[in-house]
Curated annotation (Swiss-Prot):
GO cellular component: chromosome; cytoplasm; DNA topoisomerase type II (double strand cut, ATP-hydrolyzing) complex; extrinsic component of plasma membrane
Stated role: Topoisomerase IV is essential for chromosome segregation. It relaxes supercoiled DNA. Performs the decatenation events required during the replication of a circular DNA molecule.
GO biological process, one term: response to antibiotic
Domain Topo IIA-type catalytic intervals: 31-495
Organism of provenance: Staphylococcus aureus
EC numbers, comma separated: 5.6.2.2
Protein name: DNA topoisomerase 4 subunit A
Family statement: Belongs to the type II topoisomerase GyrA/ParC subunit family. ParC type 2 subfamily.
HAMAP family: ParC_type2
Oligomer status and interactors: Heterotetramer composed of ParC and ParE.
Amino acid sequence: MSEIIQDLSLEDVLGDRFGRYSKYIIQERALPDVRDGLKPVQRRILYAMYSSGNTHDKNFRKSAKTVGDVIGQYHPHGDFSVYKAMVRLSQDWKLRHVLIEMHGNNGSIDNDPPAAMRYTEAKLSLLAEELLRDINKETVSFIPNYDDTTLEPMVLPSRFPNLLVNGSTGISAGYATDIPPHNLAEVIQATLKYIDNPDITVNQLMKYIKGPDFPTGGIIQGIDGIKKAYESGKGRIIVRSKVEEETLRNGRKQLIITEIPYEVNKSSLVKRIDELRADKKVDGIVEVRDETDRTGLRIAIELKKDVNSESIKNYLYKNSDLQISYNFNMVAISDGRPKLMGIRQIIDSYLNHQIEVVANRTKFELDNAEKRMHIVEGLIKALSILDKVIELIRSSKNKRDAKENLIEVFEFTEEQAEAIVMLQLYRLTNTDIVALEGEHKELEALIKQLRHILDNHDALLNVIKEELNEIKKKFKSERLSLIEAEIEEIKIDKEVMVPSEEVILSMTRHGYIKRTSIRSFNASGVEDIGLKDGDSLLKHQEVNTQDTVLVFTNKGRYLFIPVHKLADIRWKELGQHVSQIVPIEEDEVVINVFNEKDFNTDAFYVFATQNGMIKKSTVPLFKTTRFNKPLIATKVKENDDLISVMRFEKDQLITVITNKGMSLTYNTSELSDTGLRAAGVKSINLKAEDFVVMTEGVSENDTILMATQRGSLKRISFKILQVAKRAQRGITLLKELKKNPHRIVAAHVVTGEHSQYTLYSKSNEEHGLINDIHKSEQYTNGSFIVDTDDFGEVIDMYIS
């Protein structure tokens, strides 16, 4: 044989070969046939077991024998893949109705591997034989196997709609399928209604076939998703576990899971829930136990006393496979091609297959009945001239001669003559003559009935309906999955996710934030906080891990940070910079921080800028679900900075102090509530080149402490302040000097909580007691504290 060498481009060869491969795995491996709901390997397994007599009424046989038969005759692939497919057909948590019964370890819902095939035994289930019934009556086409040594069926007769009953899942080149299992009785009832009315709508079909019926039970939510899937082949539903509540003797409650979503690994689910408990992602779970035994699936989740079990359940629905979404993708092979099919198309394809199967079976039975009728007529004729027939046979030389003589003398046909010469003597009694005449009548009636079925389409459909009803009556079972119309919205209480713990929140002027246990704080003291050189504590307070921190910056933005998301860091150690939690700009600095326990409050924030703008916004506006980026708190115009954020429970007085020593005091009731993106209104009427250095709440018992650039501190009492209206110029608090005038660089309202001050110059920090600063009159410049000739001008002041 001479070689033929072709020059082909690699691109063409790869494209051609991959196209062939794709077609093969689509048609011959991964996708089920719409007619019998089986993939090729599943079909070959069932047929091999049936043809070898490994049926439900016989003894179990070693699985290895079946696997050997399949790969030897029909499926030349690895034995493991065949055994794996065989095992799946026996798993009652995968199939709604198992097609193979298996003795031995056939795996588990924990995804444990089955025992080796040499240890397990199997046989066809009774229902599986309904897929194969009448296969020997020329009902389906056969094709040569892979080595042309025998024949295998292209499809099984499938006397019930197996694709819908047991569903299918698979992935091939460019296609995937996910068809859920359904209740057999419901599917058959829907098929019967479709036979009666081929124009039946999906809505009408759904009166009979309610939705998927998973072997693992569970609760299905979302009728709209089911309807969409039944109409188009694609849809989405929610499947959640069945969870009940029990009360233990000690008064604690426990959640008992008895049904889990389809295809969920039970051991992985238990492990996941226990991880959520161990990692303290959910507070309130004491222990998770897998109590599954021979009586059924059971997972126990023991809860702490007085916890909200409904919230725990909702958290687990959202954060574990206690609830999953199932996506329909009903792709099957139809007319040799993969198609996305709705439920009407699937039932229609199945019905057309059954029409063909029943018609072929009827033709086969009619042919056999007519052949038998012909033989019976010959036997009856022979018995009517028995003596002559016997005499002719006795005078014949041999069997062949006898047959030829019968045909020639009495005009019997070849088939009739063969039956006569094979007739045994004991059959020549009167009883057998009567039996033959009775059989003749029965055959006449049968032939008439079979011809009627072939000639009358309605009669053929009635046969299909009768046989489907028989299967329904024999194999029907109660629905396992409960269907709920709406998808329930999951609401999770924060208390469930986060253990309640009182901690110390701290923020430094350079933006380092942390939470610290009260134990660590008490062991160290405020002064021992971990700081970088040049940094100082801006604020510290006791908060709860279930609170939320709002961090406000000079750009008019705020960061929304749940306290429990802050790193738990010892008091003596450096905190975490806010930019590592939420990204902020390089020149963006923190100006204040507050914690909120409940955003449902009448409290409000007041924002004041350097250029004299002010606004008020209620606390509920700041609640959000976005943690990953800064959010707008107030609009800050170009060349301006937010310098003050205050939180008030009710309207009160605020004082504004400017760089040139002007002061204006008015009530926040003059401010209207505005949205977060508003810029606000004018707070004070500034002089040229003046700017605001302080805006803070003030009361009658407070004093004001001011620092000037020349190192002077001035302290005044509340009575010097004159309450006025917003947007006025205000009063003067400094004595104006022609040469080197004092300018206020920092000011703070001093309350009973404050006792110390710190002045910052370019190269020095000066600490002192606030009470050592005597109260001044309105038109003075205070007392010199810092020698600016030695340490430079004062740039800031901090009180504590």
